[in-house]
Every structure is written in C-alpha cells, then in structure tokens.
C-alpha cells in the first residue's frame, strides 16, 4: 500500500512541476561608516516605486549585462486529495512532505537545461530575460501592484525593492513574468503519460490560478543597475488522477495543490573590453 501512496504522491508533485510555467560590504573606520552616494533619491509611494522598477528593469535588455539564471525556490503545499464523493485521503496528503526532496532531486537534471542559463556581456537577452520575446521587461502600473516596499542596506550601496502583484491573472502576470511555452508543457505531459501508462493517468489542468506573484529586485544605487531580480509565483492547480492496472483500487482522486517556484537572475555589469583596456594601460 505504501508503494501505491508514494506513486500517487510522486505524480502530484511531478504534475505540479511540469504544469507550471525568481553586494558590497560597508566600509568602516573606528569612528564612522562610509556610505555610497546614490544616483537617484529613494522612491516614495507605490507609484514611484513601480516607475523606478520599470526604469531599472527595462534597461537590462538595452544595456545587456552578463546574466546568470537559476531556480531559486520550489515547494508544493496545501495538497488536498480525495474521492469524488468528497472524502479526503489524509494519509496521501500527509505523505507528500516526506516525498518532496525525493521527487525534486530526481527531476532536477531534467530542469537544468530549461531553468538554468548563463549569458556573456553584450549577448542578446530578448529570449532569456523576462518578458521572453519582448524588447521590454515590465509594463506594470501602480494599479497592478498590491504592495510595494523598498529598503536600502547599511552602506546604501544597494536597495531591495519588493512588488506583490494584485489579484494576479494570466494577462497581468504576462506584463512582468515569463509564463513558459505551451509546446514545452505538452511535451512534458506526453512523456509522463507514457511512463505512467498502466499504473496512473491524470487529466490536464482543470483549473490554474495564481494565488501570489512577487518580484524581489536588488538595485545598485551608484548607477541604478539591477544586481539581481527574483520572480516568485504560487499557482493553485486542480487535476484528477486515476489508478490503473494494479493501482486501480485507488480509484479516481480529484487533487488540488499550490506550487511555488522562483527564478532568479544575477547580473554582472563589467564590460570585458573596458577591463582589458585598463589592464593594458
């Protein structure tokens, strides 16, 4: 029975992953701290913060720093599985946390190529950096944002700006996030259907809603360049799994869960040609 429960839990977590498509040290003396002079004043108020974010983030694709992209966070929570008559399968739900590490570690390699990437200074960022395929990275307005907060570090060398999107719909999220490719999603679903054939089947997404979308942007104050930006999304996904063959006794289980994941981009604004010239001198 444990194997059957593990198989169902594994499927829940795998479906979540495949259906989803985020510094300077203060110089000190014995008597005083050294602070960095900022290029611009700290923005005050939500509208000013959103405009500030748009200004610095849209400059990334124009100025083309070296970029390193990687997955920053991943989690499955609020799993609810039960029978069609509404009876909860609490044993299945409680087994999910113990299987997360196993499932995530086992699928890590499959995601490395699509989720991890690195570019050199001057490379075109149109495809890699949000919003993929566009010349811009954000078209958010103050009306799109639930909350905005900004804070400088101790020596004022960097500011961390956090934006939480208001009631995130697909159309709204597309104004600042990468949503992924329908072709990639279809290919992933097809692969897992074939692997699980005869044991388990699952429906396509019956519903997918964004419950929270957040952007955390770290900005270098001396020149208003982006040091890093993280895009974090939480999606509530509903699907149905059905046991087949030796797992037929599981029956049909409607399942819903929240899947949180983040992509983070780190920037290096060093121009190699400038560095080479300086060394030659």
Regions found by a protein language model. Name each.
Residues 1-9:
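Bacterial N-terminal signal peptides that target proteins for export
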Residues 17-23:
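C-terminal motif of bacterial Sec signal peptides marking the signal peptidase cleavage site
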Residues 26-281:
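Subset-of-secretome marker
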Residues 12-13:
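Repetitive helical segments and hydrophobic/amphipathic motifs
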């Amino acid at each position: 029975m444990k194997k059957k429960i593990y198989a169902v839990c594994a499927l829940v977590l795998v479906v979540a992953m495949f259906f989803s498509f985020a510094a300077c040290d203060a110089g000190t003396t014995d008597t005083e701290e050294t602070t960095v002079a900022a290029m611009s004043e700290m923005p005050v108020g939500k509208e000013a913060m959103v405009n500030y974010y748009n200004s610095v983030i849209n400059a990334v694709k124009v100025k083309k720093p070296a970029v390193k992209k990687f997955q920053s966070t991943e989690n499955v929570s609020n799993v609810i599985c039960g029978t069609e008559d509404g009876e909860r399968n609490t044993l299945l739900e409680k087994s999910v946390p113990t299987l997360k590490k196993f499932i995530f570690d086992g699928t890590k390699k499959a995601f490395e190529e699509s989720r991890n990437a690195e570019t050199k200074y001057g490379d075109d960022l149109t495809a890699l950096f949000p919003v993929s395929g566009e010349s811009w990275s954000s078209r958010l307005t103050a009306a799109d944002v639930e909350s905005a907060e900004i804070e400088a570090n101790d020596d004022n060398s960097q500011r961390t700006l956090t934006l939480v999107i208001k009631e995130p719909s697909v159309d709204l999220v597309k104004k600042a996030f990468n949503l992924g490719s329908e072709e990639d999603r279809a290919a992933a679903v097809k692969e897992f259907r074939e692997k699980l054939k005869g044991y388990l089947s699952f429906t396509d997404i019956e519903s997918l809603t964004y419950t929270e979308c957040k952007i955390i942007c770290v900005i270098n104050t001396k020149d208003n360049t982006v040091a890093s930006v993280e895009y974090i999304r939480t999606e509530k996904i509903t699907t149905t799994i059905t046991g087949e063959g030796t797992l037929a006794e599981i029956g049909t289980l409607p399942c819903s869960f929240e899947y949180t994941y983040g992509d983070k981009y780190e920037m290096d604004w060093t121009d190699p040609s400038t560095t080479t010239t300086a060394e030659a001198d």
